[in-house]
Amino acid sequence: MTTETVTTTAGGTVGRIRLGNTLYVAIAIITVAFANFTPLSAYVLNLLMQASTYAIAVLGLTIVLGYTGQINLAQAAFFSLGAYSVALGTTTFGLPFMPALVLGVALACIAGGVLGLTSLRLGGHYLAMVTISFQTMLSLILTNWVALTRGPDGVTNIKRPALFGDYFLDSGHYLAMCIAALFGVGFLVWHLRKTRLGRAMQAVRDNELAAGVTGINTYGTKVVAFTLSALLGGFGGGLFAGGFSYISPDQFTFGESIVFLTMVLIGGSRSPLGTVLGTGLLILLPEWLRFLKNVYLAVYGGAVILIMVFMPDGIWGFVTALWHKLNPPTRFTPGAIAPLPLTHEVARADGSLILRVTSLSKHFGGLKAVDEVDLAVARNTVHALIGPNGSGKTTLLNVLSGIYWPTAGCIELDNHDVTRLQPYQRAGCGLGRTFQNIRLFGDMSIIDNVMVGAERPNHVVAGHAAGLIRHVLAALDFVGLADRAYEAVGSLSYGHQRLVEIARALAGSPKLLLLDEPGAGLNHVEKDGLVGLLKRLKGHGLTICIIDHDMDLVEQIADHITVLNFGRRIAGGTPEEVLRDPKVVAAYLGEGRVDVSP
């Protein structure tokens, strides 16, 4: 694919995005104008105000749950912070509506940030319990701190925004403002997916371990997502208070957080459009079914259950999957793509070391998985780690990439001590990694998977959209998958998924590439292709440290071999030296494997 072709492809994508944005803005203007100028009954106005303000809060759950995969069972608490800030600000403290709303959003944002900072390392059901506790605590405060919140009696006469002096917005105009806010928030949340932060969130959701090694600050990303979720909760709550002019603690209980969660799950947690759809259904469906009188709640509950059972990804997820099934993505035919710069450092064949490991140990209680290992990897060489199963090879790679903290020892990458750096920081220093068991971001496209690798910290192409796309396509072209860039990664065969994982690592232009059994699970044809790819990488001067049990593969590409057994280094040298070493033959190769190809 030539530069012109890449530009044309990118230009077509940009054109579609601009068209979609134009249509979205047009629909927003028409909807806001309709709400502003069409007389509606008080009943309908209240329903639509509730739906629009709830939808803003539920869009926060799209970010934290749908995009990032973190549970939040306290969205009603953040909603209440915004609501009570507007309610008390405009009544007790005499603030205008807008400053009170800003205060509410700020309080929700701060509360979400603090809660995220202190609890997101827990994850799973522990995080769920923390958010439930926060929700319960805040509900008790709202009910019992009567001097401030007015307790169970609630707050009345909440002021709306004033346009001219004492003229406050009526319900129709206020509804138009809420709908405009919903369209604005929806636009931002929709486009968040295709930003660097959005891809980082989705990577954390799909595979947190791989995300960290690829260069994403997983903890920081989760905290940002949780904070944004709380911010939108507070924003929606503030607008809600202005819409109804009365609030009380029983509107913001744990049960309401469950309602918010149900809304996002029914509509489809990974799509803002699905979120709005789910919110509308849960608010409007009971009203539509009221003609059934005594049985309408049973019908309503049954409808919700059926949606959850038969559409586990929500209504919008079901529709999207059906659309992709009926309209599979088409491949584009690449021409000549500019060669991939495998590394942005100046290649040096002077024998200097890119990696120095000194007395490295990793103990799990009494088990010495890695025990005082010394390792030196020369620049622009292929260094193989071999040994029997359980010898500590993968554990060593996990320590090198920061997944495990060493018990003792030192790791230097390109003359920088990285022993105590986090995985994403080591990626920023130029360390790339693949896994024995393929770890891709399963719900992202192939090109987005590789783009995450290219956006590692300190990478020269990160943040430059056109150059980033060209670089990512070049990485895919290097492994032979450029024509499938826009397909779902889950549609690929096992062997092709292995190539995508390698392309993701290459896209980061690593100084050192760690490959953990890249040939595992491949058939003969795929393995021959892998050998050819590794030879090309070696020919480009990329420094590689590889683990593999296929000695034919190792002999063909390795310049140096280190052998581990029971966590200790037992041999090291050229393939000819190591594979004839009696200790290696006895520990790993067996007596029948003593000849080495010239």
What are these regions (language model features)?
Residues 42, 99, 155, 164, ...:
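A generic alpha-helix propensity feature with a strong bias for hydrophobic helices
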Residues 33, 122, 186, 287, ...:
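Residue-level detector of alpha-helix boundaries and kinks
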Residues 318-353, 459-470:
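Pre-NBD coupling/linker segments of ABC/ABC-like ATPases
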Residues 2-337:
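Transmembrane alpha-helices and adjacent helix-loop boundaries
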Residues 193, 203, 216, 346-349, ...:
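Residue-level marker of regulatory loop/turn positions in helix-turn-helix DNA-binding domains and
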Residues 351-356, 362-598:
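Glycine-rich phosphate-binding loops of nucleotide-dependent enzymes
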